[in-house]
Amino acid sequence: MPRENQKRGRRAAEKAEKDAAKRKREEVPEDSLPKRLKPSTDESTEINQGADYIPFDENYNENYDGNYDENQADAPAGDMPFYGLLDPEEQEYFSRANEVLELNQFQDAEERRIFIDSVYKEANGKELKIACSQGCSRLMEKLISMSDMRQIHRLFNKFIGHFMNLVQHRFASHCCETLFINAAPGVTQKVSKSKSDKMDVDEEEGEEPEPELSLAEMFIKVVEELEGNWGYLLTERFASHTIRVLLLVLAGEPVDVSANDSVVASRKKEKLGLPQGETQDGDVSAQKRSVPDVFEATLKKIMKDIVSVLDDTYLRALATHPVGNPVLQVLVSLELSHFGKSSAKDPNSITRRLIPDESFEEGSETTTFVRGLLYDPVGSRLLETIVRCMPGKAFKGLYKNFIRDQITSLARNITAGYVVLRVLERLGKDDLQNALERIVPQVPSLLERSRMVVPKVLIERCLVRGVDTAPLARALEEAYDKDPARRLEQILRLESTTQEDLEESEQKPKGPNAAPSQSSTGEKLHGSLLAQTMLTAPGPISGLIYSSLLAQSSESLVKIAKDPTASRVLQQALTVPTSSAQFRRQFAPRFTSHLKELALDSSGSHVVDALWPATKDIFFIKERMAQELTQHEMALRDSFVGRAVWRNWAMDLYKRRRGEWAMKAKGIDNNNGSGERPKSRIELARAKFAAKAEEDAKKGAQKGVTA
């Protein structure tokens, strides 16, 4: 009798159960299935779960509201409040308004103000929808940046009561950040309506009343809304940057998002592209401000609440957390710089909990923690902040017992090297001399691996502290080719980039929008910065660059001038105080017969502009260059950068009033307002001798009278 065709075993049973479950899911109607948001794949939120990684417990904070899931991307859509969607007509209107603001073709500021008022009227009642909209949230950011304080005051009032949800939203969190930054200057002001504004309000029916709360009180309301959730918001991917801005605003510290070393916003943050000078407050956000007294007490309470819900282990784990680390940097800098370095003595302070032992003895818990931060790409940024702000006594212990003996190996490391830079900035003359002697033998290997930041900072600090740079100059000379022309190509990475471009063009065709590799661009930038720093040092270090520039042919100089990164070196060499008249007399004529080509180039035009002050004391060369520019007047006037060169060289004055142009070219009208010719050295000596003789004559007359 044949056996039944039956599969046996554990794997077969598991497969049968999966098939049954799959059939059940297919039979369920699609509408009854809960919809879930797509998980985020942002690389910035991925955490390397190594041996030193401690995950944050979801239920760690007892005060944390359980309705907010740690990963908002994986949470059901119903967990976050839904403020509604804009109608297609509304989306089209706000998209066109965004385009109008980007074009910025308003006749004057009054026309722009009227347009912004009309957009606010159209957005009345839809502010939360716009802030949470992917396409229109950028418009909200631009509106806030271009609004006056009264409009910001009203918008802030609309957001009150919703900040806990908005700061966690992918798009609305950026609107909150922009709102905090632009509202910060008004916390000490009382928003008063002018008579014209009051008349407009009386004429228009249905005008919304002015908010009863001041901006300072509104910031306190925001803190009250977020209270009890600080421990969770520290590591929330969207709320983190908004919390940083809020802390800095409460402290009255500068909130400069555009700075390269800013911890306020991510480097991937999209720029709004606002025209220069179109914001209401200009660069107020980059300045320190006075704040109400209640802000300082509120800030202290926030910092206390943040660290009270975390024990020492989790606080140190936050130091290597990619989202929580920038917030910790802000907290440490505020604790040490805003409240004073004496606050670090408090055993409950953040700094003391991170670094309890200031002696940094080998094998201690503090030394192990600091060593882990040194080589961690995320943690090293916190260590930079600690080194920059920590008290002098603690810094001396860190340097003498931990960093001094291994500063050479730390400088070679690509991550720890940045901490070494912060250490060099705080060293005194004797310690800097000792560090220079240790690092100088490693300079050739550092430059070979494109680690140019350490030699650059060494030069800067030696100039500040008055340390002899001759050993560093010899090390730099040994690191590069003996041929001066080749030396400059190696420093600026011109030779390597040319070879890379040739190899890439042979291997694969480039698209029209293909960009150069990030590594080569970074190397060129650091090489240019190193060369510019070398030019500021008097003596043999700057001589290495000057001799290399004189060894270049005119064609290679034109090529360097048209390079956006390398052209900065030429501008510096023409205008820096170490540039002698003898060098400029030999160097400036190399650009003649190439001025048209350079003036029409976006980078080369800046070199032509630098030739104007560089030839102040060699008038015959400047006059020859002006004649060459005159021959290509039409080509220069047809170009945007060419018109800038024509204006900076005062060529209209050259054509019409040659005598006045000559006085301006020699720098005579810049020395004094009367337009008098500056005295020569022999004339100054004669005047000094005459004044001394007159003084002696007066003294002799006085003696005769007394006798």
Curated annotation (Swiss-Prot):
Quote the InterPro entries the UniProt record gives.
ARM-like, ARM-type_fold, NOP9, Pumilio_RNA-bd_rpt
Q: What is this protein called?
A: Nucleolar protein 9
Q: What is the primary gene name for this protein?
A: nop9
GO MF terms listed in the record are: RNA binding
Question: What Gene Ontology cellular-component terms does the record carry?
Answer: 90S preribosome; nucleolus; preribosome, small subunit precursor
Biological process per Gene Ontology, one example term: endonucleolytic cleavage in 5'-ETS of tricistronic rRNA transcript (SSU-rRNA, 5.8S rRNA, LSU-rRNA)
Top-level taxon of the source organism? Eukaryota
Extract the Pfam families matched here: PUF_NOP9 (PF22493)
**Ranges of compositional bias, category Low complexity:** 57-66
Chain's role: RNA-binding nucleolar protein required for pre-rRNA processing. Involved in production of 18S rRNA and assembly of small ribosomal subunit.
